[in-house]
Amino acid sequence: MPERLAEMLLDLWTPLIILWITLPPCIYMAPMNQSQVLMSGSPLELNSLGEEQRILNRSKRGWVWNQMFVLEEFSGPEPILVGRLHTDLDPGSKKIKYILSGDGAGTIFQINDVTGDIHAIKRLDREEKAEYTLTAQAVDWETSKPLEPPSEFIIKVQDINDNAPEFLNGPYHATVPEMSILGTSVTNVTATDADDPVYGNSAKLVYSILEGQPYFSIEPETAIIKTALPNMDREAKEEYLVVIQAKDMGGHSGGLSGTTTLTVTLTDVNDNPPKFAQSLYHFSVPEDVVLGTAIGRVKANDQDIGENAQSSYDIIDGDGTALFEITSDAQAQDGIIRLRKPLDFETKKSYTLKVEAANVHIDPRFSGRGPFKDTATVKIVVEDADEPPVFSSPTYLLEVHENAALNSVIGQVTARDPDITSSPIRFSIDRHTDLERQFNINADDGKITLATPLDRELSVWHNITIIATEIRNHSQISRVPVAIKVLDVNDNAPEFASEYEAFLCENGKPGQVIQTVSAMDKDDPKNGHYFLYSLLPEMVNNPNFTIKKNEDNSLSILAKHNGFNRQKQEVYLLPIIISDSGNPPLSSTSTLTIRVCGCSNDGVVQSCNVEAYVLPIGLSMGALIAILACIILLLVIVVLFVTLRRHKNEPLIIKDDEDVRENIIRYDDEGGGEEDTEAFDIATLQNPDGINGFLPRKDIKPDLQFMPRQGLAPVPNGVDVDEFINVRLHEADNDPTAPPYDSIQIYGYEGRGSVAGSLSSLESTTSDSDQNFDYLSDWGPRFKRLGELYSVGESDKET
């Protein structure tokens, strides 16, 4: 505390001492109009100077002062004297009044209007306001007239060390790569001090580390934090806490200080190689496992993190490199061993692999710590499994002639059980692929035989599936596709490729080609088709036509002469024999129809029918047939119409002569007949003068008795029917005795109290005695017919 007090006193008196030292030059160099000097609140009267100096410095009027200073945070028992105002016009007779105005006048600073002394009446804070500008003026005490123009002066607040440094952005976080060299910059921090940075050392800061050595250091003036130790290892310690101090007064004793924290995190670098947890791995896998199945996982641990710990796995050696593969799982950072090709326990029972794990991202700065890879041995044991039969071939292709005999052997399939037990195999045909059951197979030896005749012309290929099943385990089955090709034999005779009809002009020339025909054969010989054409033996010397074989395997028919007459013979039939080149050859006879037609001079056919001579000009046989068909259709329509007109439907209701109508209403009469007594009378509707305004209900007895209502006023003749109906509608709507039509009507008591009972009550009967309807005859003539229909007669009783 004594040291602290001495420093504060030193800060207080330092400016006063400096001002005192510089005082004589200021006095001698003062202008001629100055009569008094004010220094730091302590005025120096000119009366204390020599007589000569007083004579030189006298003036009629004027202010003399420098800047005034006042210490901040001063809290004495009395107001602190800041300075004194004085003018050379003041002889000391107390006839001059001093007035102070400006910043803080009257509130912070107070002036003695007689002596001119200025006092600070409040505690000042330089950090809030560093200086105040005020105006001083001397006026006559009695008249208040200004004696001199006002003058401005400044009161500056002197700083003291009353604010500690602050880290406004703390606490801090920073990162630095592990294994960094000595002196690597980590970050920098900044503290601020609210004291005056110009005056004294109150705002001069010095930084230091309170906690965090020996790992980090700090520049005292720049606050740059650096590494103090090289090669710090993240795997040993990842995070460090550093406490930083900022102290003012240049770090000297008695200065104020502030602290903050810095958390330094070491970031990872790839400085550690991967390492397998074990040098030997054992896995087992069934021989029937599906391709691509994961057999096992191997993992190489890496102390690094992130991408620095990523490793790729490879199979670099072993006797199963072709059967197995390994893939890297970036998520789990391990290697997955999968099956690439099928396994066979009977062939090889175990495999040995050498697996390598290598870092993907290698930092060349740490290559000397390598190699960044590791190897391990993987032992895979194949387990025996009950496998399905294996065919000797993945597919089979068989050929058979279409004329093969039934039950003849087409081919054979073979299969075996690959297991050591070697179970017997049973063969069968998947009938979904042989719906017509054209083939059979021997269940023991797999020989395929023909069950039904084949026809290559219907189907050339037959694709069936053969099933092989183990006898000891029926769940073990295998399938193989078998394609059977039907080979052709010459079993179809050739024939015309289409229905040919030749036309011959009456004015044709000898040797003219009448028609060119071609043949087709459903068979498919290996060397292609070759047809032979000839006429029947009895038609070889045909006087009218001859044939000629063409190079394209077609046939041309030629006329031997001209002068054909269609009136003598309209149609000629020419039988032609067509033979193929099969072994043995087959042949057929096709007949060509040749019509004689009338042609124009240029050979265009115009008419080929004899009827053309007897038909009307311009009307062909087709047109006559169409006309006749239309006439027949019209006759059918007329007959149908007449038949429908003559047809009469029997009436739905049979009228009985003995029908006694009495009160029965016949609704087949429009309007209800004579029983429709409630119909509106149009005359009454047109003249409703005498109608009573209220018509009581006759079907029910009202619960309450109402007084007779006043009748409606007479309306003039010719009133509109619509108005009358609206009045009646209003009466019906307001009738309290009328039940609502939307209410539930109960018919459960219908017919009760009647001797005959309800007609609508139907019930099941258990015997013929229950069906006695004799009482219907007692109901009167209306039910006589009904009683005859349902009464039990004597004949019925006898039966």
UniProtKB/Swiss-Prot annotation:
Disulfide bonds: none annotated. It comes from the Eukaryota. InterPro entries: Cadherin (IPR039808), Cadherin-like_dom (IPR002126), Cadherin-like_sf (IPR015919), Cadherin_CS (IPR020894), Cadherin_Y-type_LIR (IPR000233), Catenin-bd_sf (IPR027397). The modification Phosphoserine is found at residue 795. GO terms for molecular function: beta-catenin binding; cadherin binding; calcium ion binding; identical protein binding. Residues 1-29 form the signal peptide. GO terms for biological process: adherens junction organization; calcium-dependent cell-cell adhesion via plasma membrane cell adhesion molecules; cell adhesion; cell migration; cell morphogenesis; cell-cell adhesion mediated by cadherin; cell-cell junction assembly; homophilic cell adhesion via plasma membrane adhesion molecules. Residues 643-799 are cytoplasmic. Residues 30-61 form a propeptide. SUPFAM superfamilies: Cadherin-like (SSF49313). This is Cadherin-8.
